[in-house]
Amino acid sequence: MRFDIVTLFPELFAPFLTSGITRRAFESGLVDVQLANPRDFAAGNYRRVDDRPFGGGPGMVMMAEPLAQCLKSIQSQRTEIAPVLLFSPAGQTLNHAMVQRWSDSQGAILICGRYEGLDQRFIDAYVTEQISLGDFVLSGGEIAAMALLDAVARLQPGVLNAADSHQQDSFNPVLDGLLDCPHYTRPENWLGRPVPEVLLSGHHVQIERWRREQRLALTLRLRPELIDQARRDGRLSRADEAFLASQV
């Protein structure tokens, strides 16, 4: 798969693409990441990519033409017409289902906005989907692009040390969309806080039941809407429901 990143600050991506376990996906080409700067497609000696907003107001707006020329150059290098994603507060909040969809795709073109945003005419003409990380505003779309790339990369075969590691992540359908359970490692007692005895028992059935109940309890306390969704989807057993009833 290939992701083209349209950004005024391509240098921000260098450490991200060469660090951590997900670098395997990028360095091997399993997830091909290409960077494009709209400033390279701007006219004039100053390569200007932004201007004041019509109607007045603070800040600057990214101009449509440099973005459009940059996008056309990218599309000409791809073998298929790629969807164009814009990271924006107006977008749908990124979640596991969306990440899974993009991890199974051929990739996309990711637009990283800056300043007050993009000229709406470019959005209307080219953007096929908008994505948000949540109800807050960043200085640009680069961090959001990295979040999507990281989430997609770790789902690719051979990237994680254990192939099924991501199946135990929070929100994964394998866990019925619940939050993950707490985890512990050595020492067995730290500052008077012992590891739960069941995890030291070697009794795998009891351990798995404990983990299931911890996931249920944690999700009920912190993200009750996920419990409701799992119930609607028919993912909760009678034992699950009995445990949840005991927590009320």
UniProtKB/Swiss-Prot annotation:
Its EC number is 2.1.1.228. Specifically methylates guanosine-37 in various tRNAs. HAMAP family: TrmD. It comes from Albidiferax ferrireducens (strain ATCC BAA-621 / DSM 15236 / T118) (Rhodoferax ferrireducens). It comes from the Bacteria. It catalyses: guanosine(37) in tRNA + S-adenosyl-L-methionine = N(1)-methylguanosine(37) in tRNA + S-adenosyl-L-homocysteine + H(+). Homodimer. Belongs to the RNA methyltransferase TrmD family. GO terms for cellular component: cytosol. Keywords: Cytoplasm, Methyltransferase, S-adenosyl-L-methionine, Transferase, tRNA processing. It is found in: Cytoplasm. S-adenosyl-L-methionine binds at residues 113, 133-138. This is tRNA (guanine-N(1)-)-methyltransferase. GO terms for molecular function: tRNA (guanine(37)-N1)-methyltransferase activity. InterPro entries: Alpha/beta_knot_MTases (IPR029028), tRNA_m1G_MeTrfase_C_sf (IPR023148), tRNA_m1G_MeTrfase_TrmD (IPR002649), tRNA_m1G_MTases_N (IPR029026), tRNA_MeTrfase_TRMD/TRM10 (IPR016009). GO terms for biological process: tRNA N1-guanine methylation.
